[in-house]
C-alpha cells in the first residue's frame, strides 16, 4: 500500500493557530510539517493545535517529527495540543509520553478560522 501524501493546512482561529494534517505522517512529511509550523508561528498565537482527524498513518519517524515540532514550540514559548487522534494513536501518544507534554483533545477543534497559505506541500 502506497503512503498517502501528507499535507498540512494552517488556519488562524481566534485564540490559536491550527495545523490540519492530512495523509500519512512519515519521513516524507518533514518539509510540509516544518513549513506549516513556520506559518502557524507567524500568526503570533501562543497555542497551536495539531488536528490529526484526516491523518491516516503515523510511523515512528512521524512521531519524531511531532517531537521536534513540540520542542521547537516550547522553545518559542508556545503550547501544542493534539486533536482528532484515533484511540490507537491516543494510546501511542501516551506510551511515547507525548501526552505528558501536550494536551490531547477528544475532538477536532471547531469554530471560525481562516486558512493561510502554509501547507508546505
State the predicted function of each range:
Residues 1-56, 68-121:
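STAS-like cytosolic regulatory interaction modules
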Amino acid at each position: 500500500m502506497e503512503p498517502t501524501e501528507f499535507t498540512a493546512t494552517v488556519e488562524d482561529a481566534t485564540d490559536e493557530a491550527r495545523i490540519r494534517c492530512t495523509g500519512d505522517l512519515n519521513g516524507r512529511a518533514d518539509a510540509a510539517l516544518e513549513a506549516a509550523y513556520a506559518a502557524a508561528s507567524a500568526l503570533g498565537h501562543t497555542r497551536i493545535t495539531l488536528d490529526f482527524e484526516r491523518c491516516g498513518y503515523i510511523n515512528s519517524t512521524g512521531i519524531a517529527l511531532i517531537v521536534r515540532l513540540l520542542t521547537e514550540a516550547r522553545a518559542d514559548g508556545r503550547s501544542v495540543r493534539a486533536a482528532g487522534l484515533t484511540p490507537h494513536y491516543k494510546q501511542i501518544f501516551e506510551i511515547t509520553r507525548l501526552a505528558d507534554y501536550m494536551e490531547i483533545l477528544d475532538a477536532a477543534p471547531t469554530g471560525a478560522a481562516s486558512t493561510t497559505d502554509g501547507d508546505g506541500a
